[in-house]
Amino acid sequence: MALSDTDVSDVVDSLSLDEKCSLVRGAADPEGTATGYVPGVPRLDIPELRLADGPLGIRIPGRSSTAFPASIAVASTFDPELARRQGVAMAREAKSSGQHAVLGPGLNLVRVPNCGRNFEYYSEDPVVTADFAAAAVEGLQSEDVIATPKHYVANNQETKRLVVSAEVGERALRELYLPGFEAAVEAGAGSVMTAYNRVNGTHMSDHRRLVTEVLKDEWGFDGYVVSDWFGTASAVGAATAGLDLEMPGISLEALHEAFGIDPDAEMLAEGDDESIPAGETTTPKFATELKPAVESGAVPADRLDDMVARILGQMARIGLLDGEWGDGGALDTAEHRDLAATLAARGTVLLKNDDGALPLSDDADVALVGPGVAEAMLGGGGSSEVTPAREVSALEGIRARTDGSVAFEPGVERVVTPSFFDGGDADSDGDAEDFPGGKTPDVDAAADCAREADVAVVVVRDATTEGADRETLRLPGGQDELVAAVADAADRTVVVVQSGGPVELPWRDSVDAIVESWYPGQADGDALASVLYGDADPAGRLPVTFAPEDSYPTAAEERFPGVGEEARYDEGVFVGYRHFDAADADDEPTYPFGHGLSYATFEYGEAEVRGDDAVAVEVTNASDRDGREVVQAYVRPPTVAGVERPTRELAGYAAVELAAGATETVELTLSEHAFRRYDDSEGWTVDAGDYVIEVGRSSRDVRAETTVSR
């Protein structure tokens, strides 16, 4: 039985000042397995606490674990239950390696399409983000592992992430950037990680209003707040603002030694030397400054007690303090491998499919083109990097599935994701030994190969990483030119895009089909083959908007990357589809939020309001094959003088599997978030009037409407 709050309080009272200070800062893990480590107190039988990186899988140096698809791919399923199952699996893998907390999920909104960590986040929409946040937290914590949603808050770019100030209004914070974290807290998250950046001038580690007044007092968060690594701005400021645990608690040199990182290698910065901790920033604050601050009264003694109690309270909740933690660990199981494959397939989005180009026939002769088809696309660079025990490339998956021939040409040199941990070295020399069969990069050879096949499948990818933002939304390494050359030569061209977020597709009108598979993880080839050959319906829908780079609101320099040390969020709540759907928005998206095709055809009946918070619609699979539809409901608010609101906001969605010819009544619960708005003076308010409920297949594909009054 977990210790009670009274028991934890008694333990805190038994600790010396030195022992208390040792529990609120990290140290070097003697086993070398944990990203973050808190030493125990043997005198009182308080065990160690280990924290592992984990948005895409459990990262343990020198060990393997299941490499799940990127979070943006998971959100593309529009099925939070799958995120819950992933959380369960990741918790079991954490336990198998002796890790008590997982540093995830990542809950920052996709505000900047160029952001290098968009692959770690769910969506540009706060409702989707909140739903998946809650599901992931519930899954992780159901197995007695502490979830750590991050990075609180407004960490929407990597450029100058240590110093940039997100100059953001309260309405945008409340309506867009905070809901995911609030949902995680409501789901019982045991920890929250603060971001590197500043918000309205104050570093998040020292932001008392957001950390104590909003997170702890307003939302009732009773867990501990942990800093990002070297993300503590000051000892006194952070402790009194509400930070409970400083990580890593040791110097950068000691961290390098603990993880075997070459101290002479410069960690990736992509021309932005303030993206990575350096100099004074890497000096631990609590190690030398906290105890004197408590002794002088600068940090109240009861604040230190609260810090310790919050950490011990979560250790008690998962059974660490009474010796009941540890059962249920499992690593690289068949169940986890199957889940990784299911997530990858269901997160695959069919953007375009002219004249039934897909699915492929079993006996089609395929020209498989692309520099990365011989290796699985596991993820982006940074703290989310995972080493799987097994992985399946596109080449392996398609060859195993087809009855036809498969010819391979790389076309261009390999695009390698830079590693955040090896100095950013990315070997892209395209030497022959890099490719199966001694192939060398040659666009003409790729075009010739495509010309001889029934269909050309071109697999292209971007390269994103923590610590740097993409300079452009175009694909790197001449891949756009490769697609154009193949499309010009082939009878039928299918392009598979593996990206960490929105990309520009300048060749889209020249190809027959486009598939977005994001970073599919270890099951890359198996999942791709199942979708291309129709064994699985391409069930994913876009959780972000695809559009030309200069049409996003963050195309303005003052908004991204910012001028000096400020990024102005003066687009307010008009982010993503909210921007593109605005009445005065001239730019049309390439593919709208919620878009995704199916191999089946679906018909919608009339929409019907049910009660105060639900809408129902009949959906029919009008084709001769089974399919999976994602039914979406958007709220269009009434016009209120002097108030700018988005044209529509997502209110609910449901993924439904329908057999050929089947009809089902789908009921969607409508989130109150879509009806209300935040007023700086009055707080949350719902304007009186008629709200139009739009039901359809995307934010732009409305199939039925009804009205509800508030």
Question: Where are the regions that the model predicts?
Answer:
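Glycoside hydrolase catalytic-domain context in secreted enzymes
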Residues: 1-700, 705-710
